[in-house]
A protein has these predicted regions:
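Classical eukaryotic N-terminal signal peptides for Sec-dependent ER targeting/secretion
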Residues: 1-19
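Aromatic-enriched hydrophobic runs in primary sequence
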Residues: 4-6, 131-134, 138
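Entry/fusion envelope ectodomains
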Residues: 16, 20-112, 134-144, 148-510, ...
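Short coil/loop "hinge" linkers that interrupt or connect long alpha-helical coiled-coils or helical hairpins
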Residues: 110-123
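Membrane-active amphipathic alpha-helices enriched in small hydrophobic residues
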Residues: 120-133
């Protein structure tokens, strides 16, 4: 870790943050609901990104005048090679600048489209605020404004012409170094350098620029996560410290710099007036410490031995949920949230806002207050879902499903249906030829028994291909089918009434839908 070389004030931030982290402890619990083949993991705390903080980072460059040395000294050759790399990087950035999201040149964008499109579709709206700042820097005079603000200091708040104030930082001054330290030595000392340190120092300073250039170049001007070349750990901590957020939010961010990096963007902006400027867009966690829980769901099917005659339903509301201002923020793509011990970092851009009644779906899927989401099918394929503290196992047909301990081998064989096993003493779950490793997190699991709700449905009238449905929609379809059956019963009855024997009702008249 890079903690040792930080400035004193950053160290104290980190230490307090660390103690804070251990104090919060981890009380993850899990409930498995047999009736709906789902499980909820509770005890997490939120860190929801609700906004962006943009900051401008600058590197001062030197327009190198021709270097007069043509000597054969090995060290001078190294310096010349390094200066060539430097010049190539600057040229590369200038070319790149003409095709980054900040430039408004239409014609040029057409031919850059291929290079960019696939990427920007993914993060287009995500980087809107960073791109906006980046565009302002292209206006006449903006770069000079920043440059002069950073003349005598490495950090300054600059008010841009669109009225937005941004914190600007100068992280590397290659101009000063090349013009005042490097070139005078090379030119003065009859083209030979006595100490190799000069070469090494330049290589190190230059390396950062080369890496930044490479990253921007490979990623068409927008990178995420933000690497340590774009922003070192101490620079990032110092930025966090200057952000307009509460101390709790600062602690949270300083304590999780890796996740902050993953949720941040670096956007190439401009290179002119001997300055390279890029925008770093950091997450603002406006909601922290509210409860979060994760819902895991797996297919629940009937278990008739006759192949192809089974019906299945699966809850489709799996994902992360966090309390947020009286409602619930729901993150359907669980993998977009990053979990660090019991802390869940999610982005509200990927969320839906739901009423808090959505929780009723866990305890009573037929509740009248919230229409719970399900999908239906006839494919009783076996599978397993690894939860925070165990595994849900959907075992159907002739598949072999087992749970094993690494020392004792198989310790449980699952029969057909949906079941759950906690991670106590269990290391792996195997379903057919797929092996799953369970999470080794500590916590209490609760197995809530209940009649599997799929057994309440009549296979004859079950709508078995509803991809995106709800309990009430499925019931509606069933009622339509039942009405249809009643109607055909009547028709048959009328036809048969003319004959001597009446048919006592046809297929389905004896079947009725059981309600909870």
């Amino acid at each position: 870790m890079e903690l040792l070389i930080l400035k004193a004030n950053a160290i104290t931030t980190i230490l307090t943050a660390v103690t804070f982290c251990f104090a919060s402890g981890q009380n993850i619990t899990e409930e498995f609901y047999q009736s709906t083949c789902s499980a909820v993991s509770k005890g997490y705390l939120s860190a929801l990104r609700t906004g962006w903080y943009t900051s401008v980072i600058t590197i001062e460059l030197s327009n190198i005048k021709e270097n007069k040395c043509n000597g054969t000294d090995a060290k001078v050759k190294l310096i010349k090679q390094e200066l060539d790399k430097y010049k190539n990087a600057v040229t590369e950035l200038q070319l790149l600048m003409q095709s980054t999201p900040a430039t408004n040149n239409r014609a040029r964008q057409q031919n850059q489209q291929q290079r960019f499109l696939g990427f920007l579709l993914g993060v287009g709206s995500a980087i809107a605020s960073g791109v906006a700042v980046s565009k302002v820097l292209h206006l006449e005079g903006e770069v000079n404004k920043i440059k002069s603000a950073l003349l005598s200091t490495n950090k300054a708040v600059v008010s841009l012409s669109n009225g937005v104030s941004v914190l600007t930082s100068k992280v590397l001054d290659l101009k000063n170094y090349i013009d005042k330290q490097l070139l005078p030595i090379v030119n003065k000392q009859s083209c030979s350098i006595s100490n190799i340190e000069t070469v090494i120092e330049f290589q190190q300073k230059n390396n950062r620029l080369l890496e930044i250039t490479r990253e921007f170049s490979v990623n068409a001007g927008v990178t995420t996560p933000v690497s340590t070349y774009m922003l070192t750990n101490s620079e990032l901590l110092s930025l966090i410290n200057d952000m307009p957020i509460t101390n709790d939010q600062k602690k949270l961010m300083s304590n999780n710099v890796q996740i902050v990096r993953q949720q941040s963007y670096s956007i190439m902006s401009i290179i002119k007036e001997e300055v390279l400027a890029y925008v770093v867009q950091l997450p603002l966690y406006g909601v922290i410490d509210t409860p979060c829980w994760k819902l895991h769901t797996s297919p629940l099917c009937t278990t008739n031995t006759k192949e192809g005659s089974n019906i299945c339903l699966t809850r489709t509301d799996r994902g992360w949920y966090c309390d947020n201002a009286g409602s619930v923020s729901f993150f359907p793509q669980a993998e977009t949230c990053k979990v660090q011990s019991n802390r869940v970092f999610c982005d509200t851009m990927n969320s839906l806002t739901l009423p808090s009644e959505v929780n009723l779906c866990n305890v009573d899927i037929f509740n009248p207050k919230y229409d719970c989401k399900i999908m239906t099918s006839k494919t009783d394929v076996s599978s397993s879902v690894i939860t925070s503290l165990g595994a849900i196992v959907s075992c159907y047909g002739k598949t072999k499903c087992t749970a094993s301990n690494k020392n004792r081998g198989i310790i449980k064989t699952f029969s057909n249906g949906c079941d759950y096993v906690s991670n106590k003493g269990v290391d792996t779950v195997s379903v057919g030829n797929t092996l799953y490793y369970v999470n080794k997190q500590e916590g209490k699991s609760l197995y809530v028994k209940g009649e599997p709700i799929i057994n309440f449905y009549d296979p004859l009238v079950f709508p078995s291909d509803e991809f995106d449905a709800s309990i009430s929609q499925v019931n509606e379809k069933i009622n339509q089918s039942l009405a249809f059956i009643r109607k055909s019963d009547e028709l048959l009855h009328n036809v048969n009434a003319g004959k001597s024997t009446t048919n006592g009702g046809s297929a389905g008249s004896g079947h009725h839908h059981h309600h909870h």
